[in-house]
């Protein structure tokens, strides 16, 4: 459970880790539980996402920030709405993650301190829920420092009528 010592949200994401069919000693299979079961699942999904991105983008390697952002934004929310210190962004959803890549539903850009970026997206009629995320590598704070974000980046969404929505 989180948060990290410097206040960052941890864990990032979860995966099935209870009663997972796995190998056991004596060349057999059995049910196992714990992060030793969920972590390989996340690693395998990330490997597939990297491969999928490269196939969709002429062999170009994606940034790790993009891949993590796609993974987190496609997760199925658990617990309290939004990210929390028990479930992170939720349970991994590999299908939704690859759909984000296949449909090119992401931006890759940079922003500086006190900067401002604007991106326009068209939301098709009938969409009931829209998940939008800004992701960056937020490095750890200094040891023994008070919890504080190293980079404080905010997002807001404004529709065609000028109505602005803020996260949480």
Task: Tell me the role of every PLM-derived stretch.
Residues 1-23, 72-76, 131-140:
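Catalytic-core segments of hydrolase enzymes
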Residues 9, 16, 67, 151-153:
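Residues that flank catalytic or metal-binding motifs in active/ligand-binding sites
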Residues 9-11, 63-66, 127-130:
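Loop/turn elements at helix/coil->beta-strand transitions in domains of secreted/extracellular proteins
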Residues 14-81:
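Hydrolase catalytic cores
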Residues 30-31, 83, 156-168:
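Noncatalytic accessory or regulatory domains flanking protease catalytic cores in secreted, cell-surface
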Residues 41-42, 62, 151-161:
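C-terminal, active-site-flanking charged/polar segments
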Residues 66-103:
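Secreted, periplasmic, or luminal enzymes acting at the cell surface/secretory milieu
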Residues 89-151, 159:
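Secreted peptidase-domain scaffold signal
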């Amino acid at each position: 459970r989180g948060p990290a010592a410097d206040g960052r949200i941890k864990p990032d994401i979860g995966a099935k880790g209870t009663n997972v069919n796995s190998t056991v000693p004596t060349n057999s299979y059995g049910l196992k539980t714990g992060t030793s079961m969920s972590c390989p699942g996340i690693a395998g999904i990330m490997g597939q996402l990297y491969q999928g991105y490269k196939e969709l983008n002429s062999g170009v390697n994606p940034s790790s920030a993009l891949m993590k952002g796609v993974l987190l934004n496609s997760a199925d929310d658990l617990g309290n709405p939004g990210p929390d210190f028990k479930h992170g962004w939720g349970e991994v959803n590999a299908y939704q993650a690859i759909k984000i890549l296949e449909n090119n539903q992401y931006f890759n850009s940079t922003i500086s301190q006190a900067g401002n970026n604007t991106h326009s997206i068209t939301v098709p009629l009938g969409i009931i829920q829209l998940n939008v995320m800004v992701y960056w590598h937020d490095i750890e704070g200094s040891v023994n420092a008070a919890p504080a974000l190293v980079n404080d980046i905010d997002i807001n969404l404004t529709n065609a009528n000028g109505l602005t929505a803020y996260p949480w």
